[in-house]
Amino acid sequence: MPSPSPEASSSMSQPGPPSRSPSPASSNPDAPEASHNKTFADLGISPELCRACASMGFKKPSDIQAEAIPHALEGKDIIGLAQTGSGKTAAFSLPILQTLWENPQPFFALVLAPTRELAYQISQQVTSLGSGIGVRTAVLVGGMDMMSQSIALSKRPHIIVATPGRLMDHLENTKGFSLKSLKYLVMDEADRLLDLDFGPIIDKILKVIPKERNTYLFSATMTTKVAKLQRASLNKPVRVEVSSKYSTVSTLLQHYLLLPLKNKDAYLLYLANELSSSSMMIFTRTVADSQRLSIILRRLGFPAIPLHGQMTQSLRLASLNKFKSGGRSILVATDVASRGLDIPLVDLVINYDMPTNSKDYVHRVGRTARAGRSGKSITLVTQYDVEILQRIESHIGKKMTSFDVDKEAVALLTDTVAKANREAALEMRESGTGGGGGKRGRDKGKRKTFGDGDDRDRDDDVVEAGVPRKKNKFTPGGKKKARK
């Protein structure tokens, strides 16, 4: 094994070559059951990293890991198609760490992620896998102090995990920072990156990094945009496809609940009460409803907490950690939380709002029934959502079953919910988070607070990097918001 360069040897541990270690002996908790009997050592992973896999509970490679790692170790570009929860992070991290171990240098690899939470999660897993070789990582995301991130960059990390917007800010504004020596580029959740309008920023990033590099692109689907990005950024890639169709696992019980739109909140309260022993995630389409419903549930005695892209980064991480640790059993979230995040032991997913496509549905309900465990999902379906429900059922190849409720019990909750809704609207107005009584008031609050009439929860890094918001036809005062 080659010796490290003088610059890196002082910061990256380099023990002598050990003997072959035994195969890891515990289970890989977040990847689906593999369809092979290979070990990480069989794939060519070094004993040091095999031990790291074992310490993290990875018994054997997942299918995406078994398919991608050998090609990556041969130095090939890879496009990997696999669903969330398939073990993609280790699939690209292990080959990078192994090559880094053999030739340590700063700014060795860059991983682009669509959301801040996913960026932190990737960094944590990379750090854990590379703990035995002293890997240094830095996370660059919006909502956090630029100066502290600049200090982290001055320590010359081996691997950077970033959202595209904040990375571009540092490339343009942080003195002495460049990626001219970069050896690896990873784009994780590429379809989500492009859905969030990061395409123009990624184009800029591709222009300032070396053309001679290894590139890994991982995506749940091969969309037209992803195919275009592949052609622009990868060189003769090997295509690794674990699943070509969106599907849900057999251990997930999928239900729908047909209800009138006007009573939606009462039905949600009924479910929260009847299933109160469950750890649950409630998905909303808008930031305002995530905030509003969490307030309503808290006022009625339920341990709920919101998670959406308009919260500060510290609040987002605090919400996520409280839910993961069991401090709160209900997380009311937008689609910021639907992909990639490792949230163990979610018993129930409730779709308060219908996802607009099958892809988002699969990602949402994929937060439960992970790693062979059972789980349940309930999708609230109003009279306006029936066609969307049928499309989703057709796409996933499964029929959902109707969830039975006591309609008389629901009716008894309407006055309680209406009062809590008024109190939530008042709290949101007083705290400056928008709101007003009823749907019209809530819509008005959303326009006032969240600005652009676009009710998708888009990560702030898009705006920070200068990409205009969709449907943003009017900005009060006509002034462009400065980057953070």
Swiss-Prot record:
PROSITE patterns: DEAD_ATP_HELICASE, HELICASE_ATP_BIND_1, HELICASE_CTER, Q_MOTIF. GO terms for cellular component: nucleolus; nucleus; small-subunit processome. InterPro entries: DDX47/Rrp3_DEADc (IPR044765), DEAD/DEAH_box_helicase_dom (IPR011545), DEAD_box_RNA_helicase (IPR050079), Helicase_ATP-bd (IPR014001), Helicase_C-like (IPR001650), P-loop_NTPase (IPR027417), RNA-helicase_DEAD-box_CS (IPR000629), RNA_helicase_DEAD_Q_motif (IPR014014). Transmembrane segments: none annotated. A motif (Q motif) lies at residues 38-66. Disulfide bonds: none annotated. Keywords: ATP-binding, Helicase, Hydrolase, Nucleotide-binding, Nucleus, Ribosome biogenesis, RNA-binding, rRNA processing. It comes from the Eukaryota. Residues 263-411 form the Helicase C-terminal domain. It is found in: Nucleus. Its main location: nucleus. Residues 1-38, 425-484 are annotated as: Disordered. Signal peptide: none annotated. It is an enzyme of class 3 (hydrolase). It catalyses: ATP + H2O = ADP + phosphate + H(+). SUPFAM superfamilies: P-loop containing nucleoside triphosphate hydrolases. One of its GO terms (biological process) is maturation of SSU-rRNA from tricistronic rRNA transcript (SSU-rRNA, 5.8S rRNA, LSU-rRNA). The keyword Electron transport does not apply. Residues 439-448, 468-484 have a biased composition (Basic residues). Coiled coil: none annotated. The Q motif is unique to and characteristic of the DEAD box family of RNA helicases and controls ATP binding and hydrolysis. Belongs to the DEAD box helicase family. DDX47/RRP3 subfamily. Interacts with the SSU processome. This is ATP-dependent rRNA helicase RRP3.
